[in-house]
Amino acid sequence: MELGLFLMPLHRPDSFHADTYDQDLNLMEVADDLGYTESWIGEHFTMPWENMPSPELFVARALGVTSRMKFGIGVSLLHMHHPAHVALRIAQLDHLARGRLYFGIGSGSGTEWNKEIFGVDTAREDIHSQMMEAVSVIQQFWAGKPFHHKGTFYDTGIPEPKGDTLFDYHMIPFQKPHPPIAVAGSSPSSGIPVS
């Protein structure tokens, strides 16, 4: 039997953040020693009980206190990030993890705070279409070949090499073709169809 963890994480809002991260890292170390096979770390920007705005940073640190456990980003809210940034960060993290990484995506919960702080309406009806477009663009970046994508939400891509060896797109994942992708969903309409 395999055991895993899902860390929101939950901490009292009046807790000192540095201490809560140390507690969570200690939990990762103990779980790894006990044989837990994976841990998923949530992404939460505006929830005082769940102080984890960058699960990638936490996972990068947790990799140093574990040796076997795999980590999942649970989940990256793609509508809150540009797909090029996500592709680069997750590919780099996959190298740091040497393949001990899962990439989770989801729409999250729409809060007024996210809308007011980031200017992103997470309750819009086309949020799932944006997620589908974003994951497609991320996978194109991970392929590492020149492409241009002009879609409903994004106009981006990898340009053709210009003969300059100083600048070029180079960050493809450690795992081939990319880290396993998990899609979160709490209802039939909250996930996205992916293959």
Where are the predicted features?
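N-terminal beta1-alpha1-beta2 module of alpha/beta enzyme domains
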Residues: M1-I73, P179
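Conserved N-terminal glycine/acidic-rich loop preference
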Residues: L27-E29, S39-I41, M80-H85, G99, ...
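Internal, glycine-rich beta/alpha segment that forms the wall or movable "lid"
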Residues: H85-S195
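Active-site beta-loop-alpha junctions enriched in small/polar residues
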Residues: M8-L10, H44-T46, S76-L78, G106-G108, ...
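Short coil/turn segments at secondary-structure junctions
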Residues: H11-S15, L77, F118, T122
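Low-complexity, flexible helical/coil segments
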Residues: Y36-E43, G72-M80, G106-W113, V137-A143
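Residue-level signal for well-ordered alpha-helical scaffold segments within enzymatic catalytic domains
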Residues: V30-D33, R61-G64, H82, H95, ...
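Alpha-helix N-cap and loop-to-helix initiation/capping positions
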Residues: F16-Q23, E50-S54, H81, H85, ...
